[in-house]
Swiss-Prot record:
Keywords: Host nucleus. This is Non-structural protein NS3. It comes from the Viruses. The keyword Cytoplasm does not apply. GO terms for cellular component: host cell nucleus. Plays a role in viral DNA replication. It holds the Pfam family Amdo_NSP_1-3. Its main location: host cell. It is found in: Host nucleus. It comes from Aleutian mink disease parvovirus (strain G) (ADV).
């Protein structure tokens, strides 16, 4: 029992380290908003994921990247410090 708990804890720690590495090597949390494609049973693409829908007033188009959205002068995804864009 104790060995199984140790193995599970080690596995979770390894997954956490892998996640941190992938986020640091990528674009921060921007990977959460990347568009994915649907695939059929033959693993062939069928159509693009529908656009992200939100009612949050904090999200608007960013000058730096049209794939993510925000309403802040400091873009938390890409570090863009330019003023916000009117929508």
């Amino acid at each position: 029992m104790a060995q199984a708990q140790i193995d599970e804890q080690r596995r979770l720690q390894d997954l956490y380290v892998q996640l941190k590495k992938e986020i640091n090597d990528g674009e921060g949390v921007a990977w959460l908003f990347q568009q994915k494609t649907y695939t059929d049973k033959d693993n062939k693409p069928t159509k693009a994921t529908p656009p992200l829908r939100t009612t949050s007033s904090d999200l608007r188009l960013c000058d730096c990247n049209k794939q993510h959205q925000h309403n802040q002068s400091n873009c938390w995804m890409c570090g863009n410090k330019r003023s916000r864009r009117a929508t």
